[in-house]
Amino acid sequence: RFCHGTKSMSDENLYRYLDANKQIKLDPEGYLVKQGDWDEGVADLLAKDEELTLTEEHWELIRVVRDFYARYEMAPAMRPLVKATKQALGEEKGRSVYLMSLFPGSPPKRLARIAGLPKPTNCL
């Protein structure tokens, strides 16, 4: 029989923890469960989890996506990310090639994850 209010064990097994103290919970795709858990130290741990070492260039882009999120309440997909980067950091850095060089694969997804934001809505 079905019991209301009980949590299935499999639901909990979908999550993992970023830190040894089990304070920072990640969803199955590696995004923070609680955005309030984010700080620069957490960003470093998330980057390490992605096998990245954050440089000042990475931090510039993290600030761009966090600012974008603060304004629009959503993480940017690639085209809005390129545009926001161009506006904030100039023509040279506002190019998808530059973003790919720092966040290979899917810059919007990797940046949102490391910046402690939800997954961009149109990223698979």
PLM regions: where:
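Solvent-exposed, flexible loop/coil residues
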Residues: P28, G36-D37, V42, H58, ...
